[in-house]
């Protein structure tokens, strides 16, 4: 038959070209198609029939989505897929969003990414495990509650604060949950996890004790980040750095008290000698216990031209410091840092107090003088030096960030970051040990919630020793896949910077650290019996019991008697709660299924590299020596569409509810619906920062609008088609239809692979290219005549309908995980599915290996090259008003083109359909006589078959001339003998009706 299998001149099983066809739009020439107003033949033309709307305007989009959710069983889908008898399981563990405030676009980005992954895996045949959760405890909620209560908050008991915090968290959870459901997120909504749930808290306490029992949890007096504004210790993950913070940096003299032997030999004693120190935290000077140097570095004794005094500082810093102090230094001598050993200097505020000179590796030459002031209670490295050399670690600052009485009467009760700093600087001036003060703008840690600066102060806290855990964790991370790969290094670097993990907080809204403290001695009590008792109470009644039950019920005699313990009345429950990163970091133990308790995927924002990803890893490695995840995906943050941070002051905050349902002024903030939000997420490069704004959302809506048009064409043109009875066998289809199935299989394979790699952006780009270029601009424009003007049951028409059915199926399944509402809407309009189920209950894309015909690329691409030459020669004109003669020298190309047209001249051949002309003539040699008005176009085409084994370049000529035929009043092609008679094809179709 004319549309049969290509008769290619080589052995069966040949492989065609590996290059991809660059299909070009045919819009370069006018291509008129019949429409519903084709006069007396109107009723004989088979125009598309579908009730699927081209556009949903205004409220129609969000309303249609809600209708689809109801009609297609969105709420039952999760339980349906869990009940399937399938072998493979896919577990995505939901990192709990914080139960504080309204849903925002960051939530949308995160939840929609997870849902796309889950829906793909479910359609691909896996049983998806996805239990949403919320992080419910912690300082941000407590502070919010207290600030709303104002003065009333001062008189509240711990339990009153907890009750109000719980109510606040519950309200936020309900708001967020309803938004997530509205966005089409498929999840186990009936069994969410909450970190304030008693069963969750009990599991968390068991994990805590497992780590304690292994010697990983300990109580110690150490410097920690402390927030005076929140009156609690903070972990690194609870800090945010303010790059605009202004500190008062000072250069201070520490007078020499006792020189080391080497230094003694370099000075003559005629001038006073001081060690020069620079610090950005003047308030820590009163707590100084030592000055540190770098043993391997060179140091210098210099003479100051202004004062005549001798100073000691790093040799590399002499010029810089002299310039800063607006003086000149004359270098008297240089020596190695190690030569400072055993020397001491005077405390700059307490002359008779010695500060030893000590070697330390944390001293750098990047800033300052190469000599570092060391206050063990107020610096992590300082603490390390003090531990090594048994220095005092007295903390002079209380919970409110003010000096204690130990700091002396001049400083007592003064805030260290404000008036306290002023007084210290004045005291240094009085002591004549201040050389210079200047303002320094630098990055400084702030409390993530109160937005106020923190300090470092030593206090008794509970810590996890992560030194050993880190080694095992880093080894295990080598087996975890990170997307993008660079995220792994980021996580390891953050872990390396963390010396220990402070897990205690001095607040009440959280899980108590289950330890009892002796009333009079610095002793505490915790063992397996006390833990078992507390865990059972918490499991049944929640962690409120720690505050509501009397001590004798929390620590009953029978529990103590098991270990021969002391009287319970000597002990009281501790007042500290656990860090919320420990709360959420133990979620794997409560949520993950099966004995392995490992998730296939964790997917969160990049801030979780130092947060939840890390706390989950550390607790899991500590208790069971394995990572809780197999793959980790890290996405960026959301920004305004110009790449700026969103803020109320800039007026660029995008609220997802406004995106979905529209704002107050719907002309400015139209209702886009949830699918536009989902397309925006999928289309973004989520591995970097993600922009959102009106133009971005409009672009997403336009993409979906074009997709709807494509889908409407597909649905409308299969209205009279039943795949079971009307399909044409693939090998009997038109070449162009077979070719589209070949492209479709390639598309399906690529899209499936991209979903597996979680590269949803490439899925969108591939789909968009296919439905705009390959379908709308190319294939649809070619097949309209066959669809509209052939007989209803003509095999030529059924051939392209067979292709359209397969295209529709693949396209809908390809975008279903991204646009579930649109996918279901289309599924309801497919005419040959009488009782449509949900598209999500019918599996993933299915293609046939018989579609794979790479050799067809040579046939189609060669004709397209000729057609492009033809259309380019008649810009803006109707191609159907011209006839073409194609001249090809005998050989491979001629034989390939000949399979598209067996007659010499035809207006109905596959070749002419592709050329879109009035008629096409195929010749092996040029005609002898041509009229003067012809256009001659020359070209060459390289045939490449059998993976390059068969290569042949052929020349061709396309001769273009106006047709002598008239426009057929039915099909509008120029194939009729006169304008009032039908062309032969249409006459045959109409007479047969």
UniProtKB/Swiss-Prot annotation:
Gene3D superfamilies cross-referenced by the UniProt entry: 1.10.730.20, HUPs, Ile-tRNA synthetase CP2 domain-like, Valyl/Leucyl/Isoleucyl-tRNA synthetase, editing domain
Query: Which InterPro entries does the UniProt entry name for this protein?
Result: aa-tRNA-synth_I_CS (IPR001412), aa-tRNA-synth_Ia (IPR002300), Anticodon_Ile_BEm (IPR033708), Ile-tRNA-ligase (IPR002301), Ile-tRNA-ligase_type1 (IPR023585), Ile-tRNA_ligase (IPR050081), M/V/L/I-tRNA-synth_anticd-bd (IPR013155), Rossmann-like_a/b/a_fold (IPR014729)
Catalytically driven reaction(s):
tRNA(Ile) + L-isoleucine + ATP = L-isoleucyl-tRNA(Ile) + AMP + diphosphate
The record's annotation in PROSITE patterns points to:
AA_TRNA_LIGASE_I
Motif 'HIGH' region — list its residue ranges. 97-107
Entries under Pfam families matching the protein: Anticodon_1, tRNA-synt_1, zf-FPG_IleRS
Instruction: Indicate where the modification N6-succinyllysine is found in the sequence.
Output: 55, 175, 222, 460, 481, 756, 762
Record's subcellular location: Mitochondrion matrix
**A Gene Ontology biological process term:** mitochondrial translation
Transit sequence range: 1-29
Cell division as UniProt keyword: no
Assigned EC number: 6.1.1.5
Q: Report the domain of life of the source organism.
A: Eukaryota
Q: Which Gene Ontology cellular-component terms appear in the entry? A: mitochondrial matrix
What does this chain do?
Answer: Aminoacyl-tRNA synthetase that catalyzes the specific attachment of isoleucine to its cognate tRNA (tRNA(Ile)).
Q: Which family does it belong to?
A: Belongs to the class-I aminoacyl-tRNA synthetase family.
State what protein this is by name: Isoleucine--tRNA ligase, mitochondrial
Give the organism, scientific name: Macaca fascicularis
Instruction: Please state the gene responsible for encoding this protein.
Output: IARS2
């Amino acid at each position: 038959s004319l549309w049969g299998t290509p008769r290619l001149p080589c052995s069966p099983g040949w492989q065609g070209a590996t290059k991809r066809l660059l299909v070009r739009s045919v819009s370069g020439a006018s291509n008129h198609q019949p429409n519903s107003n084709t006069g007396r033949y109107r009723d004989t033309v088979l125009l598309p029939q579908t009730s699927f709307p081209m556009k949903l305007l205004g409220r129609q989009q969000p309303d249609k989505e809600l209708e689809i959710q109801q009609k297609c069983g969105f709420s039952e889908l999760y339980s349906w897929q869990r009940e399937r008898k399938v072998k493979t399981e896919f577990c995505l563990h939901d990192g709990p969003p914080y139960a504080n405030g309204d849903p925002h676009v960051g939530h949308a980005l995160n939840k929609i990414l997870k849902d796309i992954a889950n829906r793909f895996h479910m359609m691909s045949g896996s049983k998806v495990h996805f239990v949403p959760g919320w992080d419910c405890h912690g300082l941000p909620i407590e502070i919010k509650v207290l600030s709303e209560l104002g003065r009333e908050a001062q008189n509240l008991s711990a339990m009153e604060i907890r009750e109000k915090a719980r109510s606040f968290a519950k309200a936020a959870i309900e708001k967020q949950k309803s938004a997530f459901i509205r966005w089409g997120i498929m999840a186990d909504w009936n069994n969410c996890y909450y970190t304030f749930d008693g069963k969750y808290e009990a599991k968390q306490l068991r994990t805590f004790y497992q780590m304690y029992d292994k010697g990983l949890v300990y109580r110690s007096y150490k410097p920690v980040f402390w927030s005076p504004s929140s009156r609690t210790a903070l972990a690194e993950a609870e800090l945010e750095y303010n790059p605009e913070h202004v500190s008062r940096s000072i250069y201070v003299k520490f007078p020499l008290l006792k020189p080391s032997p080497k230094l003694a030999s370099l000075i003559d004693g005629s001038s006073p000698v001081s060690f020069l120190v620079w610090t950005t935290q003047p308030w820590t000077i009163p707590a100084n216990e030592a000055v540190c140097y770098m043993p391997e570095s060179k140091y210098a004794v210099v003479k100051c031209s202004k004062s005549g005094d001798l100073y000691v500082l790093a040799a590399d810093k002499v010029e810089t410091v002299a310039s800063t102090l607006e003086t000149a230094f004359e270098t008297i001598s240089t020596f190695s840092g190690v030569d400072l050993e055993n020397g001491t200097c005077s405390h700059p505020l307490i002359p008779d107090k010695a500060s030893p000179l000590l070697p330390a590796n944390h001293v750098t030459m990047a800033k300052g003088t190469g000599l570092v002031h060391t206050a063990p209670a107020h610096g992590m490295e300082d603490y390390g030096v003090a531990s090594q050399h048994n220095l005092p670690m007295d903390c002079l600052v209380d919970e409110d960030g003010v000096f204690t009485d130990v700091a002396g009467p001049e400083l007592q009760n003064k805030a260290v970051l404000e008036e306290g700093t002023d007084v210290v600087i004045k005291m240094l001036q009085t002591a004549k040990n201040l050389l210079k003060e200047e303002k320094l703008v630098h990055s400084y840690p702030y409390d993530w919630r109160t937005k106020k600066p923190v300090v470092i102060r030593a206090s008794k806290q509970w810590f996890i020793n992560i030194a050993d855990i880190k080694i095992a964790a880093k080894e295990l991370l080598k087996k975890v896949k990170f997307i993008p790969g660079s995220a792994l290094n980021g996580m390891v670097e953050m872990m390396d910077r963390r010396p220990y993990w402070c897990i205690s907080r001095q607040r009440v809204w959280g899980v108590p650290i289950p330890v009892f403290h002796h009333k009079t001695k610095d002793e505490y009590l915790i063992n397996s019996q006390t833990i078992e008792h507390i865990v059972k109470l918490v499991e049944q009644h929640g962690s409120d019991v720690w505050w509501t039950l009397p001590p004798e019920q929390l620590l009953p005699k029978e529990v103590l008697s098991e270990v021969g313990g002391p009287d319970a009345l000597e002990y009281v429950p501790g007042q500290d709660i656990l860090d919320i990163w420990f709360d959420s970091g133990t979620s794997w133990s409560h949520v993950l299924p099966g004995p392995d308790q490992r998730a296939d995927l964790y997917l969160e924002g990049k801030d979780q590299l130092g947060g939840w990803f890390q706390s989950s890893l550390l607790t899991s490695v500590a208790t069971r020596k394995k990572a809780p995840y197999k793959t980790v995906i890290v996405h960026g943050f959301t920004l305004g569409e110009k790449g700026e941070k969103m803020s109320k002051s800039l007026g660029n905050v995008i609220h997802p509810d406004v995106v979905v349902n529209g704002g107050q002024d719907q002309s400015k903030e139209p209702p886009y619906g949830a699918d536009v939000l989902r397309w925006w997420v999928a289309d973004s490069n989520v591995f970097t920062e993600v922009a959102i704004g009106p133009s971005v959302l409009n672009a997403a809506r336009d993409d979906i609008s074009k997709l709807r048009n494509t889908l409407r064409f597909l649905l409308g043109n299969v209205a009279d088609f039943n795949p079971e009875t009307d399909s044409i066998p693939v090998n009997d289809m038109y070449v162009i239809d077979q070719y589209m199935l070949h492209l479709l299989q390639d598309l399906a394979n690529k899209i499936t692979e991209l979903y597996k790699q979680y590269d949803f952006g490439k899925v969108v780009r591939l789909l968009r290219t296919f439905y705009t270029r390959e379908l709308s601009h190319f294939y649809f424009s070619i097949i309209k005549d066959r669809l509209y003007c052939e007989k209803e049951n003509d095999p030529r028409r059924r051939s392209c309908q067979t292709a359209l059915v397969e295209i529709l199926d693949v396209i809908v399944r390809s975008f279903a995980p991204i646009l579930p509402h649109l996918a279901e809407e289309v599924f309801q309009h497919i005419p040959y599915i009488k009782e449509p189920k949900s598209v999500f209950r019918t599996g993933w894309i299915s293609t046939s290996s018989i579609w794979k015909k790479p050799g067809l690329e040579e046939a189609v691409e060669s004709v397209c090259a000729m057609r492009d030459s033809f259309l380019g020669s008649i810009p803006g004109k109707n191609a159907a008003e011209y006839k073409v003669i194609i001249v090809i020298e005998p050989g491979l190309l001629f034989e390939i083109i000949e399979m598209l047209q067996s007659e010499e001249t035809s207006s109905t051949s596959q070749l002419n359909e592709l050329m879109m002309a009035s008629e096409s003539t195929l010749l092996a040699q040029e005609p002898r006589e041509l009229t003067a008005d012809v256009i001659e176009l020359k070209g060459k085409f390289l045939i490449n078959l059998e993976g390059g084994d068969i290569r042949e370049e052929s020349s061709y000529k396309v001769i273009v001339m106006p047709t002598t035929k008239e426009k057929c009043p039915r099909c509008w092609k120029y194939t009729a003998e006169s304008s009032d008679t039908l062309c032969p094809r249409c006459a045959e179709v109409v007479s047969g009706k």
